[in-house]
Regions:
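N-terminal strand-loop element at the rim of the active site
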Residues: 8-15, 21-66
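Acidic donor-binding loop of glycosyltransferase active sites
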Residues: 139, 251-266, 279
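Nucleotide-activated donor-binding/catalytic signature segment of Leloir-type glycosyltransferases, i.e.
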Residues: 223-241
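Short hydrophobic beta-strand element within catalytic cores of glycosyltransferases
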Residues: 280-284, 294
Length: 365
């Protein structure tokens, strides 16, 4: 069986959308290829472990440069890795730098999770030089939606090598319930593009309760904003939540809010978790795959990015109409079962592996 090495930032139980996607892809590939993971550790220690049958090497970090975790041992680990295919999950500056240093021999595919949203000069001076060695060599570029395939400027020179493989979820393990006290849920990293400040301003002057899950550099600022807006006990910041707690919150919430303000939100994996739980979504019209996942007036509502008034109106509409929430939630569940199952993900991965010569044409999915 051929071996595929996935290079991520971190790996579960570390939280994050990319982390969940890498894990899901590895699990969906079981029996097709042997999946291994090279990622960074949240501490200074380098460890190897096995999670759900997947061998994971976590390289210790010594701090960060800006928002980039620094793992000095990463290039050496990449040089020593044995694989028939490397899948580099992007954006991932330290992994790109390591790739540029090592120039590993196995074929390469880039899983393009989202655009790098930076000022043009900053991108040209700092990001593009370390990205070029990998991008020029990659045999395939994988994106999660047709919208991202169309709009990703970094992939424009390589359109013939782009493949759309939407993310998948095990819908059988997600079931929604009607909680005794309806609330809006946000779950994600506390970084600027997530737009939690817009959500907080949307909640001002309403009686809507919200639970905000996650952590990151903006958390302190957003907690202070909630206090300034007088939201008090109306809004609860939980910090990072274990999987079991996040699942319980998702399954008992009334609405998922995804108030992202830039195309750095390329898909919004948390939307799949909401739809699998039969929960409606309020998302924004960022030019990415977010609005391809959540269908306006079908599985939820879509509002202009950065517009607190429109977000407030959408949340009030759904929170005030249990029947509409139920209808949107049921439509979301159907959409997951039709488009975003692990079986569909596995079929698409098998086709990719066949194209790259890792799987025989007759091999079953």
């Amino acid at each position: 069986m051929k071996r595929v090495l996935h290079i991520g930032k971190f790996y579960p139980p570390a939280p994050g959308g990319m982390e969940r996607v890498v894990e899901t892809v590895c699990l969906a590939s079981e029996g097709l290829v042997e999946s291994r993971v090279l990622a960074m550790h949240t501490s200074h220690e380098t460890v190897e472990d096995t999670r759900d049958g997947i061998h994971v090497t976590r390289i210790g970090t010594i701090g960060s440069a800006g928002s980039v975790a620094v793992a000095p041992g990463f290039p050496g680990a990449l040089r020593r890795a044995q694989a028939d295919l490397i899948v580099l999950h992007e954006p991932n500056p330290w992994a790109l730098l390591s790739y540029a240093i090592v120039h590993p021999r196995p074929p390469l595919a880039i899983w393009y999770h989202s655009d790098v949203v930076r000022p043009a000069l900053q991108y040209a001076l700092f990001y593009a030089p370390i990205a070029k060695p990998a991008y020029r060599r990659a045999e395939r570029y994988i994106v999660s939606s047709p919208a991202l395939a169309e709009h990703a400027a970094a992939l424009a020179p390589y359109r013939d090598r782009v493949r759309v493989i939407p993310f998948g979820i095990d819908a059988s393990s997600w079931r929604g319930i009607d909680g005794p006290s309806p609330f809006v849920l946000f779950a994600g990293r506390h970084v600027a593009y997530k737009g939690v400040d817009v959500l907080l301003r949307a909640l001002r002057g309403t009686s809507i309760r919200a639970v905000i899950v996650g952590d990151g550099p903006k958390r302190g600022e957003w907690e202070a904003l909630a206090a300034t807006l007088g939201l008090g006990p109306q809004v609860r910041f939980t910090g990072d939540a274990p999987d079991v707690e996040l699942r319980a919150l998702m399954q008992s919430c009334a609405v998922l809010a995804l108030p992202s303000v830039t195309r750095a939100e390329a898909f919004g994996y948390v939307q799949l978790e909401a739809m699998a739980s039969s929960k409606p979504i309020v998302s924004t019209d960022v030019p990415s795959g977010v609005s391809w996942v959540n269908r306006h007036e079908s599985t939820g509502l879509i509002v202009p990015a950065g517009d607190a008034g429109a977000l407030r109106a959408a949340l009030e509409r759904l929170m005030g109409d249990p029947s509409l929430r139920r209808a949107f939630g049921e439509a979301g569940r159907r959409r997951v079962e039709e488009e975003f199952t692990l079986a569909r993900l596995r079929e698409r991965l098998a086709q990719l592996y066949r194209e790259l010569g890792l799987l025989a044409e007759a091999a079953p999915c």
